[in-house]
Structure formats: C-alpha cells, structure tokens
Amino acid sequence: NAQTKQVSMLEGTDVPTLKRYIVEGQQFYYRNQQHPGSPIKDLVQVYYQFKNEQKAGLGMPMPAGIVRVYQQDSKGGVQFVGEDRIMHTPKDETLNIKIGNAFDVVCERKQTDYLRISSNVYEMEYEVTLRNHKSSAINVDVNEPIGGSWRMIRSSHEWTKTEAWAAKFNVPVAQDGTAVLKYRVRVTY
C-alpha cells in the first residue's frame, strides 16, 4: 500500500558529545591570484562528535542510515537539532554527525598577497576572519587544502599538516568576539 515506516534502531540519551565548528577551504584558492582584498564568505559547519561505546549508552554496530540529533531546550522540551547520513559504524568507533551550518559564526577569507617567484613557485598570504556571535567561546578548525608541494612560511596560529595536501588550524574565538588567522604559504607545482 506504498507506505513508508521509520523504525528507531538505536536510541541513546545523555550521550557525551563534542560540538565542533569546522571551515573547509577550497582547492582553487592556490591555483591563481584571487582578487586581493575581496573577502569570500565560507560556511562554518557544525558537527557533533561522539563514540559509539557502551558507557555512552550505545556500543552496538550501527547500520548505515540517518542519525537524528535532539537536544533539551531551556524549558525542558526536546528540540530537533539536525540529522546526517552515516556509513555502517562498528561499536567503539567515533562518529562525526554534521548537523548543519552555524548561523551565529561567520567566516570571511581574503587573499592579502600573491607573489610569483618562478614559473612554478608561488607564495600566497591569506587572512581568515572568524566572528563569533554566540554567548560562549568556541574553537574553530580551519581546514585548508593546499595543492602541490608546499611549505608554511608563517602563521599566526598553530597548525598541523593533516595530509600531504592539507593544513589544519585550530582558532579559538572569544564569546561575541573576533579572531583573525593569518598565514603565508609557498607552493611549488
């Protein structure tokens, strides 16, 4: 009779989670000179991270499908926060559930310098401004894909090379505050 039924496979309450704010840069930033000084807005994605373990009230294999996240509001009611599709996930593995984009955290990126050193070597400098309009301080992971062979010349914040072609910056942003990440990278193609 063409009906669709949804069945709850697994339910956890009071699951300890880590709320993460993530900005994903785009590969094209390093391919040519952008318009220095012209800011580009980037989305700040919101993730909840948790471990599928017994002590969190979970701890059993999760089949691929949709995971919905609910949160208690200030009046004790339960509010839908977001949902994401997951792959098959064994017990004791970590899940990252993307629940959407932050509306109270703003990211703007601009290229502040572009230098062609030779036919295949370039230096670029970027400024990533994060504005937090929340009533609490947050940390934002800024993930920057960088093509070619690259070397970080300088950075205002600590960073890690997460892959051959990517750097990750962790930027703390104060409550109702602004933080500016500045970095310069040399790329060889």
Which ranges hold each PLM region?
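Long, intrinsically disordered, low-complexity accessory segments associated with secretion
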Residues: 1-189
